[in-house]
């Protein structure tokens, strides 16, 4: 059976149980109201501000959680932007495409922001944000490459799985060409091996639109 993943091997940080990366106990936020104090974990509190975190590898459980959060926020307000912060080494192609399809389907604009590393499927999701609203922090890193996979079994079974991973490769390359404006043959060439970019290089490539510069005290967004 094929394991078609677009996974960055340097960052092997899989946390399938949560759509966020949170080592140790979750930080909590206490809010005071007329009904007394209420405690929220920090990510639930940020979800109320329409902020979602993808800080882990991408698998089916993570995809289900992100899709559910996007659908919930769309139902809450179909006109207000959804922000997705991405620090991910990549993961399952099919799970990533489930997240991607939902990003394209929901009515609100989906803002994508890279912090840390957006590699492989993480970079693909970063590029799939709303045009003009794909951002990266100054010291983030972005990496694109082709899907990784392997198969075993009888020759015919291996042939079937090989055709599937080639189909996924062509699908991802075509979508990335649409989002970046790069020719399909350049995408195919660049993703043949790991291809790392700085935020400024990612702007030139078309993977993102702007680099966030907070040196002025406030969150200032500057053209790359």
From Swiss-Prot:
EC nos: 3.4.21.92
Function: Cleaves peptides in various proteins in a process that requires ATP hydrolysis. Has a chymotrypsin-like activity. Plays a major role in the degradation of misfolded proteins.
Protein name: ATP-dependent Clp protease proteolytic subunit 1
Coiled coil: none
CDD domains noted in UniProt: S14_ClpP_2
Keywords of this entry: Cytoplasm, Hydrolase, Protease, Serine protease
Main location: cytoplasm
InterPro entries per UniProt: ClpP, ClpP/crotonase-like_dom_sf, ClpP/TepA, ClpP_His_AS
Quaternary structure, from the entry: Fourteen ClpP subunits assemble into 2 heptameric rings which stack back to back to give a disk-like structure with a central cavity, resembling the structure of eukaryotic proteasomes.
Entry-linked Gene3D superfamilies: 2-enoyl-CoA Hydratase, Chain A, domain 1 (3.90.226.10)
Keyword Cell membrane carried by entry: no
NCBIfam families: clpP, PRK00277.1, PRK12553.1
Catalytic activity of the protein: Hydrolysis of proteins to small peptides in the presence of ATP and magnesium. alpha-casein is the usual test substrate. In the absence of ATP, only oligopeptides shorter than five residues are hydrolyzed (such as succinyl-Leu-Tyr-|-NHMec, and Leu-Tyr-Leu-|-Tyr-Trp, in which cleavage of the -Tyr-|-Leu- and -Tyr-|-Trp bonds also occurs)
UniProt organism field: Parasynechococcus marenigrum (strain WH8102)
């Amino acid at each position: 059976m094929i394991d078609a993943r677009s996974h960055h091997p340097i960052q092997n940080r899989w946390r399938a149980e949560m759509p966020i990366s949170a080592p140790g106990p979750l930080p909590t936020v206490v809010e005071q109201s007329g009904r007394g104090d209420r405690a929220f974990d920090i990510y639930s509190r940020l979800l109320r501000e329409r902020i979602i975190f993808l800080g882990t590898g991408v698998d089916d459980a993570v995809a289900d959680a992100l899709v559910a959060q996007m659908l919930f926020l769309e139902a809450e307000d179909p006109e207000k932007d959804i922000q997705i912060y991405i620090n991910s080494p990549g993961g399952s192609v099919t799970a990533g495409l489930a997240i991607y399809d939902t990003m394209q389907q929901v009515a609100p604009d989906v803002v994508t922001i890279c912090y840390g590393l957006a590699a492989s499927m993480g970079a693909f999701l970063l590029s799939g944000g709303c045009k003009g609203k794909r951002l990266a922090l100054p010291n983030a890193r972005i990496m694109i490459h082709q899907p990784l996979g392997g198969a075993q079994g009888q020759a015919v079974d291996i042939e079937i799985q090989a055709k599937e991973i080639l189909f996924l490769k062509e699908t991802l390359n075509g979508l990335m060409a649409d989002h970046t404006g790069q020719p399909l043959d350049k995408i195919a060439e660049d993703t043949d091996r790991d291809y790392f970019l700085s935020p400024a290089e990612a702007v030139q490539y078309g993977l993102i639109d702007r680099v966030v510069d907070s040196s002025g005290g406030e969150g200032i967004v500057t053209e790359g």
